[in-house]
Design a protein with these regions (language model features):
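Catalytic, metal-anchored helix/loop core of enzyme active sites in primary metabolism
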Residues: 1-381
Length: 381
């Protein structure tokens, strides 16, 4: 019985992970659930899955959560960022699913790696911000990082059994988001409500906006570089509106392996949990007769965030960290009508130019760079 800790259990990935665990309750048990603000939902989940502990990151909700679980004394209730770092180190835990959003996922992921827990990585910002550090720590502590993003899971599934066969190119697919066919003038006027209507995936608000701007795909290019040791110029983004081909790998003989399936995040979540085994999963099955599969080149002028991600990789150091911090600020501002859709890229680009460059950042440098970039980006709103 694998004991699983879910960082971010009330979000889109977290709730779908609990569905997987419920389907395979003979194999998986929830050791800990965590949330940032949604304490009522966290309490409901705790009642259903009976974990050993729950953590609410926002300390303001601690008393309310404790009250909701007062009749279940076996469930320990903790609060705060430090509690997140400590809970992932708990001895019974086998796997940690990092489904938190943003920079906040970095510290508990590092603590989980140092405690030699298998990492099911859904928090892509961890590798965007500190890919070099995370990969070095994973190697040092002999920890497996299993990708949960559908694209990276597809790449991972495509290279299983390939041993040392060299990857010639990664074909990273993108839906193109809701504004794929918009002109720049049309994109100038879009609002958060428009961007939150993703054509193929059901995701949280932050990642849905990132998908609309294609910053999410930029993050995934960086994530793929670190996960698979492939340089950015060998990672090609393909706009694939149907989201059926989740990604593909081209090898040096010209052969291409791809992973296909209906857009259902439970599949990559379950694959990370069960690897190398495949377990049954209820849900729709792929019908290739239903629709044609299309592929287009992304428009880097319209979707500047994707171009900036390649630039951040090229510059290296703390630049991806700076880009991520600025993006978190403008993404939230856009969702609250304090920033225009195209203005997000302007502010991110300006922050990348103005923030202090550090060629070989330490963990403390990442913390400082994140704070500095947030201040710079916020000053332009």
């Amino acid at each position: 019985m694998k004991q699983i800790c879910i960082l971010g259990s009330t979000g889109s990935i977290g709730t779908q992970a609990l569905d997987v665990i419920e389907q395979h309750s003979d194999r998986y048990e929830v050791y800990c659930l965590t949330a940032n603000n949604r304490y009522e939902m966290l309490a409901e989940q705790a009642r259903k899955f009976r974990p050993a502990a729950v953590v609410i990151a926002n300390k303001a909700h601690y008393e309310a959560l404790k009250l909701l679980l007062a009749d279940l004394p076996d469930i320990k209730v903790y609060a705060g960022a430090k509690a997140l770092d400590e809970i992932v180190e708990a001895q019974p835990i086998d796997m940690v699913l990092t489904a938190m959003v943003g920079f906040a996922g970095l510290s508990p992921t590092i603590h989980a790696i140092k405690a030699r827990k298998t990492i099911c990585l859904a928090n892509k910002e961890t590798l965007v911000v500190a890919g070099d550090l995370i990969c070095r720590l994973a190697a040092e502590y002999h920890v497996n990082i299993l990708p949960v993003d559908s694209e990276h899971s597809a790449i991972f599934q495509s290279i299983v059994g390939e041993g040392d066969n060299e990857i010639e190119k990664i074909l990273l697919t993108a839906s193109g988001g809701p504004f794929r066919k918009f002109t720049l003038d049309e994109m100038r006027d879009v609002k958060a409500a428009d961007a939150l209507r993703h054509p193929t995936w059901d995701m949280g608000a932050k990642i849905t906006i990132d998908s609309a701007s294609m910053m999410n795909k930029g993050f995934e290019v960086i994530e793929a570089k670190w996960l698979f040791g492939v340089e950015a110029d060998k990672i090609q983004v393909l706009v694939h509106p149907q989201s059926i081909v989740h990604s593909a790998v081209q090898f040096r003989d010209g052969g291409v392996k791809a992973q296909l399936g209906v857009p259902d995040m439970r599949l990559p979540i379950q694959y990370a949990f069960s690897f190398p085994e495949r377990l049954p999963l209820n849900g729709d099955r792929l019908d290739l007769f239903r629709q044609p599969l299309e592929f287009f080149e992304p428009d880097m002028e319209k979707f500047r965030c994707l171009a900036m991600a390649y630039e951040a990789i090229r510059r290296g150091g703390n630049v991806p960290c700076i880009m991520n911090a600025a993006n978190e600020v403008v993404n939230e501002a856009f969702r609250h009508d304090r920033c225009g859709f195209l203005q997000m890229a302007d502010i991110i680009e300006a922050t990348m130019q103005r923030a202090t460059f550090i060629a070989q950042p330490t963990y403390d440098d990442y913390i400082a760079s994140d704070a500095e970039a947030r201040r710079i980006a916020a000053s332009m709103l």
